């Protein structure tokens, strides 16, 4: 089949790039643990073996490819080769905090994609992006454009100089020619200015339209910030995005506008009063241009980055659409893995994109496609070839349900991106005994600046207002994980919180002491597990795999099970997230020792519990 707008195939031999990286070896902490067994990820897919083609597949399925004209410049076939090499330094946006620009290095090159690493941090925070992404910039861009650069951990801000850093560490900066002007819409209209107000869709909760501010402008893109919320909800979009609308759009279209968090009397929010009180201006309505519908339709085929395992791109089908999004299904996989993605996401591509850019394509598996080598451990999840890990890029593969991003136990976990900034400040928040409720609530500054406000997810805050009617209404273990383990900065999953929310009908107040509903009370824990009493969750979260195994070995009657935790590469954070089901059914540990281990985990979690007043006074959330 003739590919539309096909460019010549790009040569991206990752092995050659790895050979060039001898002098740019990553820090000791970034080294990936090696398994004794051969990783299943070394088995090539059917596509890699040359046994699969889009032309044949479309004929067999009697399917149609999504027309290449529907894809944006960032999604379609690239015009240039990927010239980045492993070890090159650059500046770029932290996907978890879109307002933050960081020192990055290229950790891996695959086709037209890059795995980027935050200098000074563990590789579990690495993320994937396209080589032509507008989120990455050459060394010195922040200084030139007057953006703050977040320097590597361990360096002083006032002492950091790019050229000195590169020279001292014998590093290479990415050449400026690799970063091209990517402004398809021309220069930004002067009508858009930083600090102006508008109404914007919350991409994490697309049913909500909220009061927002233009927090930054780069080329033809806006940084949307939701007033009085932390920057994890921010996002970049172009000026014609359907996600941004002029002030008054909700009122004109019969939609509910969500007022800023902490705004008095949010039901009677008035733009006139708000603009006057904040001494700000609205973006003129005339500068907003209506974008044409995205044009994607159900049953169209395309290639999509797998959000659960972002090093992979899979054959996919659109199964549903709405105004701004498409719902994708990975061919050959169960529909439980389907999810919604923005129609303008850089992670969706026309068919043939992988072939043109030299990126492996994960195709629908057949029984005879999966070849298992003698002595090779096999992931039990149907369709999974053992590539990737729930703990992120730190581990290249897995061979059990515990590490599998697709296993039922991990299906709702948001594992693709860890939040290094929240985890970095965790210890500071815990050690600050004067950290009062008022500090975690909104500061009532609605000027669009990134104040240090409540960083809990909106759905988690809503969970605090749930009334537990009975054990059948809410999974207490999951609710405990959301309310107690996560509020002060450990990883959380919005999808996980949402799942818990949807299991309850009544919304009122939640018990301020969820620990009382768990298998053992605190006093009983202290008596049965005296060695656990003085250890806090923040300490456990920093444990290595060996330290977790050593702790399990120290528990009476659990000595022989320590090797199981070592085999599964369970570190402190993973240990805190284990459930009783994980320990008994997945790790195959007998009930007696499993209960002792699980009750230790509960004890650690309880040490992280918020003060009663903070739990009971959950803030009102949007919607």
From Swiss-Prot:
Binding residue positions for Zn(2+): 379, 384, 398, 404
NAD keyword on record: no
UniProt-annotated stretches for the region Disordered: 1-44
Domain of life assignment: Eukaryota
Zn finger (CCHHC-type) start-end: 370-414
Keywords annotated in UniProt: Chromatin regulator, Metal-binding, Nucleus, Repeat, Transcription, Transcription regulation, Zinc, Zinc-finger
Gene3D superfamilies, A to Z: 2.30.30.140, 4.10.320.30, Transcription Factor, Ets-1 (1.10.150.50)
GO MF entries: chromatin binding; histone binding; zinc ion binding
Record's subcellular location: Nucleus
Compositional bias (Basic and acidic residues): 10-35
SUPFAM superfamilies noted in UniProt: SAM/Pointed domain, Tudor/PWWP/MBT
Record-linked SMART domains: MBT, SAM
A biological-process GO annotation: negative regulation of DNA-templated transcription
GO cellular component, one term: nucleus
Location of the SAM domain: 543-607
Chain positions of MBT repeats: 52-152, 160-260, 269-364
Signal peptide per UniProt: none
Cited function: Putative Polycomb group (PcG) protein. PcG proteins maintain the transcriptionally repressive state of genes, probably via a modification of chromatin, rendering it heritably changed in its expressibility.
Protein name per its UniProtKB record: Lethal(3)malignant brain tumor-like protein 4
Gene: L3MBTL4
């Amino acid at each position: 089949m003739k590919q539309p707008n096909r460019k010549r195939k790009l040569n991206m031999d990752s092995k050659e790039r790895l050979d060039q990286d001898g002098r740019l070896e990553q820090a000791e902490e970034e080294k990936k643990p090696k398994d004794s067994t051969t990783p299943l990820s070394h088995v090539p897919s059917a596509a890699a073996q040359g046994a699969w083609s889009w032309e044949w597949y479309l004929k067999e399925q009697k399917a149609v490819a999504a027309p290449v004209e529907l894809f944006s410049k960032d999604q379609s076939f690239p015009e240039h080769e990927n010239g980045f090499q492993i070890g090159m330094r650059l500046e770029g946006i932290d996907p978890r905090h879109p307002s933050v620009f960081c020192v990055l290095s290229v950790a891996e090159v695959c086709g037209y994609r890059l795995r980027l690493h935050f200098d000074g941090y563990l590789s579990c925070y690495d993320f994937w992006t396209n080589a032509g992404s507008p989120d990455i910039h050459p060394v010195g861009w922040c200084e030139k454009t007057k953006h703050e650069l977040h320097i590597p951990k361990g360096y002083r801000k006032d002492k950091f100089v790019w050229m000195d850093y590169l020279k001292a560490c014998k590093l290479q900066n990415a050449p400026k020619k690799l970063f091209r002007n990517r402004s398809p819409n021309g220069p930004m209209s002067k009508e858009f200015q930083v600090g102006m107000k508008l109404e914007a869709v919350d991409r994490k909760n697309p049913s909500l339209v909220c009061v927002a501010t233009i927090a930054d402008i780069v080329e033809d893109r806006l940084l949307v910030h939701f007033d009085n919320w932390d920057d994890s909800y921010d996002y970049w979009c172009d000026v014609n995005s359907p996600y941004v609308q002029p002030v008054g759009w909700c009122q004109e279209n019969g939609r509910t506008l969500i007022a800023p968090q902490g705004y008095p009397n949010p039901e009677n929010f008035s733009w006139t009063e708000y603009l006057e009180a904040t001494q700000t201006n609205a973006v003129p309505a005339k500068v907003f241009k209506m974008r044409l519908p995205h044009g994607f339709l159900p049953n169209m085929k395309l290639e999509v980055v797998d959000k659960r395992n972002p090093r992979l791109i899979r054959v996919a089908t659109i199964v549903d659409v709405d105004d701004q999004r498409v719902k994708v299904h990975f061919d050959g996989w169960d529909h439980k893995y389907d999810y919604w993605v923005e129609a303008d996401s850089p992670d969706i591509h026309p068919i043939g994109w992988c072939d043109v850019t030299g990126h492996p394509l994960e195709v629908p598996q057949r029984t005879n496609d999966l070849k298992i080598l003698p002595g090779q451990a096999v992931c039990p999840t149907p369709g999974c070839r053992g590539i990737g890990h729930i703990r992120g890029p730190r581990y290249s593969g897995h061979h059990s349900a515990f590490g599998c991003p697709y296993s039922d136990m991990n299906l709702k976990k948001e594992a693709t991106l860890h939040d290094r900034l929240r985890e970095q400040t965790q210890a500071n928040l815990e050690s600050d005994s004067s950290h009062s409720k008022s500090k975690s609530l909104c500061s009532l500054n609605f000027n669009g600046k990134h104040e240090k406000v409540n960083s809990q997810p909106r759905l988690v805050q809503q969970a605090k207002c749930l009334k537990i009617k009975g054990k059948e209404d809410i999974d207490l273990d999951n609710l405990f994980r959301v309310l107690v383990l996560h509020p002060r900065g450990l990883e959380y999953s919005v999808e996980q919180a949402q799942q818990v929310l949807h299991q309850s009908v009544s919304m009122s107040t939640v018990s301020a002491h969820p620990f009382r509903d768990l298998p053992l009370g605190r006093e009983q824990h202290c008596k049965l597990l005296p060695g656990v009493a003085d250890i806090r969750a923040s300490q456990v979260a920093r444990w290595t795999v060996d330290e977790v195994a050593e702790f399990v070995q120290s528990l009476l009657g659990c000595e022989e099970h320590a090797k199981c935790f070592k085999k599964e590469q369970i570190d402190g954070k993973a240990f805190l997230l284990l459930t009783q089901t994980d320990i008994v059914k997945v790790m195959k540990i007998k009930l007696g020792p499993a209960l002792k281990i699980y009750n230790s985990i509960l004890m650690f979690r309880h040490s992280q519990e918020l003060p009663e007043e903070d739990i009971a006074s959950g803030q009102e959330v949007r919607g």
